[in-house]
Amino acid sequence: MRRRFVGALAVSEQISRTENNAMPDFGSWGTAWWKPLLFIIVAGHITNVCVTLFLHRSQMHRSVKFHYLAALPMRLWLWLSTAIVTKEWVACHRKHHAFADRDGDPHSPLLEGLRNIVLKGAFYYRAAVRQPGVLEKYGKGTPNDWIERALLTPLNWLGILLMLAVDLYLFGFFVGPIVWGVQMIWIPFWAAGIINGVGHALGYRNFEVKDESRNISPIAIWLGGEELHNNHHADPHSATFKAKWYEFDIGWVYIRLLSLFGLAKVQYARGSSRG
């Protein structure tokens, strides 16, 4: 009787192992606290860089052209991490430049208050792109290829669900949703909130322009170079946001590196071809 019980237990354990091996390895990166933190930081910086290089400098201001092999990965990453539709983002930002800190600006802290822009910047963005005629007037010239028409625009929600699946697989059912949640508020906070809010309220100015844009920091790394916001508003079509010798624009560094491999072509840069 004892032998039969032990044998049945062994068979049960073997079946359990087989079933477990057949299941996806959720939490495959383990439980070390620093792993999800590192992932958030690296993924967040990549998102910031894709926004400033592809959406802002290339699509919005036409200051740099990217080879398809460079542009497509950035477009796909933004699809996965933000659900941003290129035409909507470009239209909103062009309207911002047309009415910077005046009536009509979609996200001015002078009009709406700094706290509102920092905390609710994404809501102002959505309200702007839903206004009749905004996309038609300000969203011209953005990609209209097959992948945009079939996937990135009509199924923009699908990318962030795939990212959720990745986060669940890497970090499990508890930490994974937290990582995903941080990714989902990343651009609404850092771009719509900090750049468009703090970048028009706090910081230093190299140039007297018609709006209240400010440089948040002379060393522009975390936000891909967008910290140099006053420099950008003074010369919006420049591929480099650096204006002084002591300033650093990491976005410009990435552009120069891509140029070395024939993946980027600068159309205009402040000062000279080397920025």
Task: Tell me what each language-model feature is.
Residues 2-194, 198, 238-275:
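Non-catalytic, topology-defining segments of multipass membrane proteins
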Residues 139-146, 202-228, 232-235:
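Active-site-proximal inter-transmembrane loops
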